[in-house]
Amino acid sequence: MKVAVIKYNAGNIRSVDYALKRLGVEAVITSDKEVLKAADKVIFPGVGEAETTMLHLKESGMDRFIKELRQPVLGICLGMQLMCRFSEEGNVDCLGIFDTDVKRFAPRKHEEKVPHMGWNTISCLKSDLFKGFTRDEFVYFVHSYYVPVSEFTAAETDYIRPFSAALHKDNFYATQFHPEKSGEAGERIIKNFLEL
């Protein structure tokens, strides 16, 4: 199986690569469209800022290319947010794969800190990504923006408000949390993605 990780100006690519290596998978980290198109699975990771990253994706033509991929694609954190229609982070149009917007957390109480950083459980598991997953397992989040619960929600969690922890539409899967940093539970999610 050929697994490709999209290389662009965003962080956490190395941690995704390490997580795949722990599962015995040698991924190709590339921005080469032909290599990405030929891969069996594509991972779209990201830690960064939406406006700058979308500008980079548009300049390289990756914005149109990612939407045309037909194999299973997994967006992680910023990767998930960029798959949405619009982000309040920089008020930027995104890829529009998921017809929903990305909003900024608005804390209502002093003890509600932004960014949402740390471990949280997820529920309403409506995707094969979560095969063998139980409600009491924790995954790791680091983000200041969220995607509201919608028809594309494959899992949800609650921090300040309920929001989408994962999305799914056709061949596109996405997690707001970092499976590559979520221990055994995250490893299982990556393994499930690779088995789709």
From Swiss-Prot:
It catalyses: 5-[(5-phospho-1-deoxy-D-ribulos-1-ylimino)methylamino]-1-(5-phospho-beta-D-ribosyl)imidazole-4-carboxamide + L-glutamine = D-erythro-1-(imidazol-4-yl)glycerol 3-phosphate + 5-amino-1-(5-phospho-beta-D-ribosyl)imidazole-4-carboxamide + L-glutamate + H(+); L-glutamine + H2O = L-glutamate + NH4(+). One of its GO terms (biological process) is L-histidine biosynthetic process. Pathway: Amino-acid biosynthesis; L-histidine biosynthesis; L-histidine from 5-phospho-alpha-D-ribose 1-diphosphate: step 5/9. PROSITE patterns: GATASE_TYPE_1. The keyword Cytoplasm applies. GO terms for molecular function: glutaminase activity; imidazoleglycerol-phosphate synthase activity; lyase activity. InterPro entries: Class_I_gatase-like (IPR029062), GATASE (IPR017926), Imidazole-glycPsynth_HisH (IPR010139). The active site is at C77 (nucleophile), H178, E180. GO terms for cellular component: cytoplasm. Its EC number is 4.3.2.10, 3.5.1.2. Residues 2-196 form the Glutamine amidotransferase type-1 domain. It is found in: Cytoplasm. Disulfide bonds: none annotated. Heterodimer of HisH and HisF. This is Imidazole glycerol phosphate synthase subunit HisH. It comes from Bacteroides fragilis (strain YCH46). The lineage of its organism: Bacteria, Pseudomonadati, Bacteroidota, Bacteroidia, Bacteroidales.
